[in-house]
Amino acid sequence: MSRRLGAAAAVLLLWLAVLTFALHGYYGGRLGSARRRNILLQHPALALHLPTRKMLLAVASFDDASSPSSLTTTDRHHHHHRHHGHHHHRGHDRWNRKGVPPTAAGPGEEVDPRFGVQKRLVPTGPNPLHH
């Protein structure tokens, strides 16, 4: 009798795990989402293989790739790679591009030319938190 009870408990736990995955893992806990229903109607094969988040990403990327503006987005991202020989971006790594000299204010009153705010003193030396 106890062996039969153990088997019934195992089957019950297995069914609960399957139902939990089906309701929360697969659908993300939102069974009545209108967008999901529309996606499933347009692409029914996705419902059998992909979890909800991956399904939405796959459909969104498929829609983005098929849109006419996707080509201009790709061109914009790869614009810099066409001009490897040109060096018209030389000033990007300099912190003081405009050449503004530091002000002659006293210590602690100096204005940072990058951010336009007063510079703060940074403590130097050993870290007091390390023993």
UniProtKB/Swiss-Prot annotation:
Keyword annotations from UniProtKB, A to Z: Developmental protein, Differentiation
Keyword Hydrolase: no
Disulfide bonds, paired cysteine numbers: none
Tissue specificity comment: Expressed in all aerial apical meristems, including the floral and inflorescence meristems in the reproductive phase and the shoot apical meristem in the vegetative phase. Also detected in the primordia of lateral organs such as the leaf and the floral organs.
GO-annotated biological processes: cell differentiation
Region feature (Disordered): 67-131
Biased composition (Basic residues): 76-97
Family stated for the protein in its record: Belongs to the CLV3/ESR signal peptide family.
UniProt-listed PANTHER family: CLAVATA3/ESR (CLE)-RELATED PROTEIN 10, INACTIVE PROTEIN FON2 SPARE1
Record function comment: Non functional suppressor of the fon2 mutation. In Oryza sativa subsp. japonica, the protein has a single amino acid substitution at the putative processing site of the signal peptide while in all the other varieties/species of domesticated and wild rice tested the protein is functional.
Name the UniProt record assigns to this protein: Inactive protein FON2 SPARE1
Species this protein is from: Oryza sativa subsp. japonica
Organismal lineage: Eukaryota, Viridiplantae, Streptophyta, Embryophyta, Tracheophyta
